[in-house]
Amino acid sequence: MVKELLRNHSSVRIYDGNPISKEIIEELIATAQMAATSHFVQAYSVIWVTDEEKKEKLGMLSGNPRQYETSGGAFVFCVDFKRLQSAGKLEGVDIVADSAENVLVGVADVSLFAQNFVVAAESMGYGICYIGGVRNKPEEISELFNLPEYVFPLFGLTIGVPARRNEVKPRLPVAAVLHENEYNTEKYEELLPAYNDTMEAYYNNRSSNRKIDNWTKQMADFLIEQRRPHIKDFLAKKGFNWK
């Protein structure tokens, strides 16, 4: 049953607008906390946005206003080393937070934590959508939610009862992501064109927003230029100087 749940995931962008109770939200957070965490640092915090004005501003800043408007719960998932700084002070030491390694640890911790939250939510019949758009305006979002030094927003997330469900989007074939004993680049020459055929058929036949497109073209268009070049300077301002 768990495998079936995971394989049927699709992002939900329009919800029925009914709020999810605090009891359920806290249950989902407690479940999320049981995810694996590097060296038990638990380098995550979540902003639950219940203030309608803040929710509206978040939607505008991240470029997803309708998702936030109709959702039953709106969140910003953050990498958090501020709490670890407080832990160090209790022990009379200054922790070294500003390292590239700690950024990676925080990103991994938040991602695992969030995915536990998502799977638990979907098991209860809710839909979700991750929102990377919070990194478009990270300084403004940090100010909106009073995020201190050593805390930065990684992604947003909406949850709610779906008003409409999307079809499951085909993933890359297993052979494209599973490498035995050593990395194999040559297989992409065969696998990627075949995957393009799969994605072209999906886009042409899905129930809404049909288009002519394929995966390699999407990725080429997406990665042809540097994305969010402001992030490095933003992280430095937050105390992460990539030592």
From Swiss-Prot:
EC number(s) on file: 1.-.-.-
Source organism of the structure: Pseudomonas sp. (strain G-1)
InterPro entries on file: Flavin_OxRdtase_Frp, Nitroreductase, Nitroreductase-like
Family to which the UniProt record says this protein belongs: Belongs to the flavin oxidoreductase frp family.
GO molecular function, one term: oxidoreductase activity
CDD domains the UniProt entry points to: NfsA-like
NCBIfam families: PRK10765.1
Entry keyword Plastid: no
PANTHER family assigned: NADPH-DEPENDENT OXIDOREDUCTASE, OXYGEN-INSENSITIVE NADPH NITROREDUCTASE
UniProt cofactor(s): FMN
Protein name (database record): CR(VI) reductase
